[in-house]
Amino acid sequence: MNYVSKGTELRLAIKELVFDYMSNSPVCGAYADGLKQAEIFRQCGLDWGEYPNATSSNQQYWIVALLRELESEGKVQRDIDSKKWRIK
């Protein structure tokens, strides 16, 4: 098995899941308030629960790169003041 290819495939699938969720969530609409990254993370089922040194709050930080990639593609935007994410 090529683990790098499989990892890339999984990242792309999760990126698609997050974008699909945001596209279909009224709270993340272009003119809506948006959601914090932790809320998006949990609503997409990506939270593994609470573990020592891996709390739910710590786990959600990896989604930052995913949201920044969607932002670089012109698909989402982050409100500067509220720090919430929404569809662009």
Could you describe each region identified by the protein language model?
Residues 71-80:
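A short, conserved structural fragment
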Residues 39-41:
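A short acidic, leucine-rich amphipathic alpha-helix
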Residues 51, 80-81:
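Residue-level detector of family-conserved "landmark" positions at structurally sensitive sites
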Residues 27-33, 45-63:
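Short, positively charged loop/turn segments that connect secondary-structure elements
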Residues 1-34:
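Short alpha-helical segments that sit at the start of domains
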